[in-house]
Amino acid sequence: MNKTKINSNTKQPSLWALSPLLVFLCLYLVVSLIVNDFYKVPITVAFLISSVFAICITKGLSLNERVMQYSQGAANKNVMLMIWIFVLAGAFAQSAKDIGAIDATVNLTLQLLPGNLLLAGFFLAACFISLSIGTSVGTVVALVPVIAGIAEKTGMDMAFMTAIVVGGAFFGDNLSFISDTTIAATRTQGCAMRDKFKVNFRIVLPAALVVLGYYIYRGFGMDVPPESYTIEWVKVLPYLVVLVTAFMGFNVALVLLLGIIATGVVGLCTGSIGIFDWFGSLGTGMSGMGELIIITLMAGGMLELIRFNGGVDYIIQVLTRKINGKKGAEVCIGALVAIANVCTANNTIAIITVGPLANDIATKYGVDKRKSASILDTFSCVIQGIIPYGAQMLMAAKLASISPLNIIEYLYYPMGIFIMAMFSIFARWPKKYS
């Protein structure tokens, strides 16, 4: 039986080795601009073309060896662990939705809002819900219709009210233990989610408090008649299980598995779902992660060929000429993920794309991996939160019947965490991790 040798060595640093990444970014960006829709162009196709290009330009190996080298990158243990987590996260999210856990969490949050603290309350609701469910899009879909209706009743500016939810949604997108961005950032940097959370939370907390304070100030004088929401307390349990076990430091796969079990127990006990319907929900959730899994595999393979051909070494070599210590390295990491996010309109993909490069930079300059993971996640959320063609902005604008461009000027939280991210770099904050 013939065995194909896998080469783990790299060639001399080469600018040409980076061309597959440039092909991907240019292809996806240019084609998206032509059709004027960043979500009609399949990102999987862009990765497929750039992957084929990467295989074609790889020299010194037979075609079979090139494909095997590509496959080695796709089968990297960190990539595979990310995929297993994506599968579990998809199963949990869909089953939680189908048993009514999302609606229960939303209603509980809304019932607790006092009228004169409506703005601050919705910001907190968006923060809590996104932290619980790990998705900013889900938070936007759940809350924007409600806050849009309130805006109509109170005469408040629709764009301003919508921006409250969009901004708050990125609090959880940035920090949640089950967020794709958190998973991608921690896996590519090789640090624990709990440790990344501690650093990331210290960076963004001041921004969250300032924005919250502003909403409290703006909320005084508002007179909104209270509404009664039906709260099904037991259906909140799956999210509480996820939050509590995550904060206790359980393995993320175990956290999600316990959450999945909780959705089944709660759904069956309350009669919200039958056993086979629950199985169907789990299957639908896992299948729904298919595109992200394919993208992750192809990104891993393409980046392995870039590494093998000397592309990573070239970037490190060029950046190290101008980087002065940890501060410069952290700025570079933030810039890398920000640029990738502008081109892909997807913060998870941006992190997956540049994460390995950021990890190399962090290693070379002694940047704490908890800090580099936080920088990756925070800068990606900043860009995703303000680009008008991001999924969150497009969804919010559609639900509120306004233009995405109208929302941007009121996105105080994404702007705030950008300021704090830059402050954390130049002021060396938090001190312990800088």
Which residues does each PLM region occupy?
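Juxtamembrane helix-boundary/capping and inter-helix hinge elements in multi-pass membrane proteins
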Residues: 61-63, 75-79, 98, 155-159, ...
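Hydrophobic alpha-helical transmembrane segments of multi-pass integral membrane proteins
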Residues: 83-93, 112-146, 319-359, 376
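Hydrophobic transmembrane alpha-helices of multi-pass small-molecule transporters
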Residues: 1-87, 199-295, 434
